[in-house]
């Protein structure tokens, strides 16, 4: 583990497994653009997830946090799109979204997989998990895509 020192952060030793320099991180996240029409609460969460991926050059674990964080944006939008969402957990929102045709079967499958990963980490079942950026970027991209698709459809 790299010890951070001021005045500049030091790249995580593992960063060089996937990029040669910090500037390469911009290419890694360049397609993660928040589209118009996304509620500001979800847009802020997606931008934060993107920046966590970018900063995983300095703290490798940020890529894992980015995946977990990006699911928050999906949950925000699902709550907005699903009638009577109330305080249902994400699992319930995914099931209802699929049943109501708000989510496709494929979207529901991806979200449920991400939810299981998130829950495993959040509830201590999966500890010391580090998701390399090569795995994290497609998962965060999926959250961006699902939010974009949900927001392209008028709320019911």
Task: Give short role names for the model-derived ranges.
Residues 2-116:
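Amphipathic alpha-helical interface elements
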Residues 105-156:
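Charge-enriched, short contiguous segments at helix-coil
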């Amino acid at each position: 583990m790299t010890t951070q020192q001021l005045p500049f952060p030091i790249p995580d030793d593992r960063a060089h497994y996937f990029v040669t320099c910090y500037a390469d991180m911009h290419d890694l996240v360049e397609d993660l653009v928040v589209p118009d029409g996304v509620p500001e609460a979800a847009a802020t969460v997606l931008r934060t997830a993107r920046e966590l991926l970018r900063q995983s050059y300095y703290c490798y674990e940020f890529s894992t946090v980015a995946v977990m964080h990006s699911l928050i944006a999906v949950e925000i939008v699902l709550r907005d799109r699903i009638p009577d969402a109330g305080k249902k957990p994400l699992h319930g929102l995914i099931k209802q979204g699929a049943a109501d045709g708000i989510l496709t079967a494929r979207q529901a499958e991806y979200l449920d997989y991400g939810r299981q990963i998130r829950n495993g980490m959040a509830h201590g079942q999966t500890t010391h998990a580090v998701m390399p950026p090569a795995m994290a970027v497609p998962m965060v991209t999926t959250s961006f895509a699902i939010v974009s698709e949900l927001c392209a459809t008028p709320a019911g």
